Design a protein with these regions (language model features):
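Extracytoplasmic "Venus flytrap"/periplasmic binding protein-like
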Residues: 40-114, 150-152, 157, 251, ...
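Extracytoplasmic/periplasmic solute-binding protein
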Residues: 123-134, 139, 163-215, 257
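Extracytoplasmic/periplasmic substrate-recognition and gating elements
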Residues: 44, 127, 151, 228, ...
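Short, solvent-exposed loop/beta-turn-alpha elements that line the ligand-binding surface or hinge
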Residues: 99-114, 158, 200-225, 272-273, ...
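A structural signal for short loop-to-beta-strand junctions that line the ligand-binding cleft
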Residues: 67, 75-76, 107-147, 290-296, ...
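Glycine-centered hinge/linker elements that transmit conformational signals in sensory
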Residues: 166-171, 209-242
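Long, aromatic- and glycine/proline-rich binding clefts that accommodate carbohydrate-like moieties
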Residues: 113, 281, 335-395, 399, ...
Length: 432
């Protein structure tokens, strides 16, 4: 018996598996696809086990990770949405930059493999990647081809400019549509991506990339005119405000609104749940704005690595990121979820596999984010407390859409309130 116990004791260390916690914000089908990634990695080797844990929406997930870090019970990996990048960067002592992790663990990792829109958003000034790109999306236009036919519009041609959207919406309303068009994510689409696609700044300091002393500047004529036009169109339901986040999507799927501008990541869901033929197009632009169209910016999230976990876990995290970087893994994630292929190799593989030929509209998002090389106005937004600032912008947009404020007054107020939040963040992070 003693010999048997000794044999078991001797064998145990070789059989030990290191568990690695991964906190995330994906539920439903996306959550199942995420869990499949973890399961596939776990099955590919025997040393490490990725343990996914759903913690609610992005805000709830980040908040849970912050509180866990304070009690020293944090996960090794946490999924963080793009607008919290500036806040995460300020937490220097808590994060383990991905470029350092991969270098320390001798795992190959090249920012050049990723799309410029991705590296620009998540890299430091030296081009070093701070977090691991995971789920990326950008806004595109969806339209109901059946309703286009009823309105006498060509169902094979999507509106490319805002004047064309307005003209189409007018005809759609005249033909019986409840609303001509609507959008999800009001600030992300109508302020942040609107500005990027027209090569206009959100703020000074290269949208915050060059320092915490950035000042918001989006209350300028082009953005004001755009919001004012939406307000005017709303009077006749050519445009109809449908709320924040994804609340507009069902109005397109149920046939109320003929045109919908939303995340490219909803493409698969829209195609599966809409009882009509769906058309796709790029985000519209105003043709009289010099430099438009430029490129859109991404939304979604990346994976951040937190410090103060056992050393063995970091080796496993690095191997997991190498696994996720494989073209076939990236391509499958892109095809199964609707998120962008964040590497050029994954895009090329997906194209070679004929996916874009079989799925019209699936390539529009990557064509749009790579339309032109990113400028300092179109590589992203890196402002502290931007989660809160986006909320302020949407509050003020609602004031405009409800007729309580003019577009100019609403955007002026959003800039003033947002700048107060920026100064608070700057004071709270004096050493950054």
């Amino acid at each position: 018996l003693a010999a048997a116990v000794a044999a078991i004791s001797f064998a145990s260390p070789a059989q030990a598996v290191t568990d690695i916690m991964w906190w995330h914000a994906m539920s439903g089908e996306l959550g199942r696809q995420l869990e499949k990634l973890a399961a596939d990695f776990n099955a590919s080797q025997s040393e490490y086990r990725i343990v996914p844990g759903y913690k609610g929406n992005y805000t709830e997930t980040v908040t849970a990770a912050i509180f866990a870090f304070r009690s020293r019970s944090q996960p090794a990996i946490v999924q963080v949405n793009e607008i919290a990048t500036g806040t995460m960067m300020a937490a220097r002592g808590a994060i383990y930059p991905v470029f350092e992790l991969m270098r320390d663990q001798a795992e190959a990792f090249s920012p050049a493999a990723y799309l410029p829109a991705v590296t620009g958003y998540y890299a430091d000034v030296a081009g070093n990647m701070l977090s691991f790109p995971f789920n990326a999306s950008t806004p595109i236009l969806y339209y109901n081809k059946n309703m286009f036919r009823s309105a006498g519009l060509d169902p094979e041609i999507s509106p490319k400019t805002w004047p064309e959207v307005g003209a189409a919406a007018k005809r759609l309303r005249a033909s019986g549509a409840v609303c001509g068009f609507t959008t999800s994510w009001p600030s992300w689409i109508n302020v942040e991506n609107f500005s990027a696609f027209h090569n206009l700044p959100i703020s000074t300091k290269a949208n915050g990339f060059d320092g915490l002393d950035a000042v918001l500047t989006f209350n300028k004529p082009a953005v004001v005119r755009h919001i004012a036009q939406l307000v005017e169109w709303q009077a006749t339901k050519m445009f109809d405000y449908s709320g924040r986040a994804t609340s507009a999507e069902p109005r397109f799927q149920n046939g109320e609104c003929a045109i919908f501008i939303g995340s490219s990541a909803t493409r698969a869901d829209i195609r599966a749940n809409s009882k009509f033929e769906v058309g796709y197009g790029m985000l519209p632009y105003w043709p009289d704005v010099q430099g438009a169209p430029q490129n859109t910016i991404i939304g979604g999230a990346t994976l951040w690595v937190l410090r103060d976990r056992p050393r063995d876990e970091y080796k496993g995290v690095a191997k997991f990121f190498s696994f996720l970087s494989k073209p076939e893994i990236q391509a499958a994630w892109h095809q199964n979820t609707g998120y962008l292929p964040v590497t050029r190799a994954a895009f090329d593989l997906t194209r070679e596999q004929g996916f874009y030929d079989r799925n019209p509209g699936a390539a529009i998002s990557i064509e749009q984010v790579t339309l032109k090389p990113p400028t300092e106005n179109s590589k992203g937004v890196r402002l502290g407390s931007f989660v809160l600032i986006r909320g302020v912008i949407e509050e003020e947009l609602e004031q405009a859409f409800s007729g309580k404020k003019s577009a100019q007054a609403a955007l002026d107020s959003a800039v003033e309130r947002g700048n107060r939040l920026l100064r608070q963040f700057e004071r709270a992070n004096p050493d950054r």
